[in-house]
Swiss-Prot record:
Keyword flag Cell inner membrane: no
Catalytic activity: a plastoquinone + NADH + (n+1) H(+)(in) = a plastoquinol + NAD(+) + n H(+)(out); a plastoquinone + NADPH + (n+1) H(+)(in) = a plastoquinol + NADP(+) + n H(+)(out)
Quaternary assembly: NDH-1 can be composed of about 15 different subunits; different subcomplexes with different compositions have been identified which probably have different functions.
Organism per entry: Synechococcus sp. (strain CC9311)
Protein name: NAD(P)H-quinone oxidoreductase subunit K
Gene symbol of the encoding locus: ndhK
Subcellular location: Cellular thylakoid membrane
Length: 253
């Protein structure tokens, strides 16, 4: 490429850039300096980085608390933990939220309402399953006929937060991990890889299993052997005493 007229050549521009990046006269050799060159004061970024930075810095959660796990999340609203530093602004409408925090037991009757709230949230949206009851059903998963064995059977879950209940510090750790996930996403990839099977569209079918608590432990061999000495002891008949004065059944005339 040849330069025409008064336009500077590529080599002259490179020399000017190297000269501007060098130390200023009178400054110590190797000390950091601020240059006046425009190329040294411009930060280059991408659309994905800018978009992800804006989203991870302003997550608006929709709090869906159904049990005791929500009490631990309510502690974050106070001044001790101050979760506002992460840009979390609780919303009461799913149309204004992009993060759904499910804390507590999800029942069959609340399942359709939860799915409806999730579908009303705009894309991109994320879900945090908080607590053992939300993830696996918890202590209600043994013999309950109304508890859902994991909220991921109804809606997709981006992050699982185990605990019974999780501490507020664990909730902060979950939010930080979710921010890292948001920061590594791409707008084009999310549009192309939009899942169509994100949640179950059929009714939650429960598999019949044998009950765990049946009361049969009272009829176990070891229990019978332990109770046999006491069972074989004859019981003494209760003592009967007769009253000397008859009991009147009515008022005397």
């Amino acid at each position: 490429m040849t330069s025409t007229g008064d336009s500077p050549s590529i080599q002259s521009l490179r020399d000017l850039r190297e000269a501007s990046c060098g130390p200023v006269g009178g400054a110590a050799e190797g000390s950091p300096t601020v240059t006046n060159d425009l190329s040294e004061n411009v930060i280059l970024t991408s659309l994905d980085d800018l978009h992800n930075w804006a989203r991870l810095s302003s997550l608006w959660p929709l709090l869906y608390g159904t049990a005791c796990c929500f009490i631990e999340f309510a502690a974050l609203l106070g001044s001790r933990f101050d979760f506002d530093r992460f840009g979390l602004v609780p919303r009461s409408s799913p149309r204004q939220a992009d993060l759904l925090i499910v804390a507590g037991t999800v029942t069959m009757k609340m399942g359709p309402a939860l799915v409806r709230l999730y579908e009303q949230m705009p894309e991109p949206k994320y879900v945090i399953a908080m607590g053992a009851c939300t993830i696996t059903g918890g202590m209600f998963s043994a013999d309950s006929t109304t508890a859902v064995r994991g909220v991921d059977k109804l809606i997709p879950v981006d992050l699982y937060l185990p605990g019974c209940p999780p501490r507020p510090e664990a909730i902060f750790d979950a939010v930080i991990k979710l921010r890292k996930k948001v920061g590594n996403e791409s707008v084009s990839d999310r549009r192309q890889l939009k899942q169509t099977h994100r949640y179950c569209t059929i009714d939650h079918a429960m598999v019949p299993v044998e009950p765990i608590v049946t009361g049969a432990y009272l009829r176990a061999e070891t229990q019978v052997a332990a109770l046999s000495p006491g069972v074989g002891v004859p019981m003494a008949a209760p003592e009967q005493t007769e009253s000397a004065e008859p009991v009147s059944s009515g008022a005397s005339s």
